[in-house]
């Protein structure tokens, strides 16, 4: 009954439509920001911070709203707080990224330290399976182990 309701109302399809839009927007966002920064292409950075990031956030917030409706229709509320934290964290991180770019473009900061650093390779011979450990890839800083 619940699955029929969700399909009939298009919620499942709407969710995946928004998910696809979010992933399409985020897939190479960091690479493009780094490239534009390295090339000092401030117009591209402005386009990203003022248009692309807000569009991704809008799609993500709508996706989150739809996902919550699906969850509450299909399951008990217990456990949804984990999706709140994860999706809310992505939204907050995108907002912070936009603010950092805007601060740079407005001259509030002269450089973006996080974009000056050499990128670490994703795979190395000594690497453990960190890509499957959210708690270990959320930051390059070890302070998150104390939270």
Cite the ranges covered by each PLM segment.
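Catalytic domains of carbohydrate-active enzymes that cleave complex glycans
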Residues: 1-147
């Amino acid at each position: 009954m619940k699955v029929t309701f969700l399909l009939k109302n298009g919620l499942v399809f709407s969710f995946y439509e928004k998910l696809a839009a979010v992933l399409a927007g985020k897939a190479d966002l960091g690479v493009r920001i780094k490239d534009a920064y390295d090339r000092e292409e401030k117009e591209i950075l402005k386009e990203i911070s003022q248009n692309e990031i807000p569009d991704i956030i809008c799609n993500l917030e709508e996706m989150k709203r739809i996902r919550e409706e699906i969850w509450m229709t299909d399951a008990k509320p217990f456990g949804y707080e984990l999706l709140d934290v994860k999706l809310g964290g992505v939204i907050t991180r995108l907002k912070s990224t936009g603010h950092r770019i805007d601060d740079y473009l407005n001259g509030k900061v002269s450089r973006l330290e996080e974009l000056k650093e050499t990128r670490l390779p994703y795979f190395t011979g000594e690497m453990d399976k960190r890509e499957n450990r959210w708690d270990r890839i959320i930051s390059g800083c070890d302070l998150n182990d104390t939270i």
